[in-house]
């Protein structure tokens, strides 16, 4: 039997895109301060807003008064949210190119954390590199010492 177009039935419905707005934190040009750029993402329910935020941080700002903070070559591998915690996993380039300045290191960490926490369902962030928990980024301690 030959199937015609009207014989084909799709199981499931196409996902409706939803709009998610996040505050992306970039460096204010020429300063050691963070500036905010509001960005709206159109995502389907199966797409991760947290991963979209990380990819936008890596792509850089559209506002001319802001600058990208994350080192070149860094990739966002994944971002999942579980019970208010966002697990953000990056490629090894994040730790291969740590800036010397402690202030710069802190800005990078704050950029990631504050951008992800602008999503209403993210309360805390755990930064990972290639699936391993990052305990510090240069001189910036990310996890308290275990007793």
Regions found by a protein language model. Give the residues of each.
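Bimodal "functional hotspot" detector
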Residues: 1-147
């Amino acid at each position: 039997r030959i199937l015609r177009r009207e014989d084909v039935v799709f199981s499931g419905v196409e996902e409706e895109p939803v709009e998610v707005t996040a505050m992306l934190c970039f460096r204010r040009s020429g300063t050691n301060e963070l500036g905010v750029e509001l960005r709206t993402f159109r995502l389907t329910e199966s797409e991760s807003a947290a991963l979209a935020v990380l990819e936008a941080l890596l792509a850089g700002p559209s506002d001319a008064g802001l600058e990208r903070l994350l080192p070149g070559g860094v990739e966002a591998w994944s971002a999942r949210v579980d019970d208010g915690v966002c697990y953000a996993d990056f490629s090894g380039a994040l730790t291969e190119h740590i800036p010397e300045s402690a202030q710069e290191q802190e800005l990078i960490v704050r950029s990631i954390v504050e951008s992800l926490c602008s999503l209403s369902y993210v309360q805390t962030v755990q930064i990972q590199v290639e699936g391993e928990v990052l305990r510090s980024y240069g001189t910036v301690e990310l996890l308290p010492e275990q007793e």
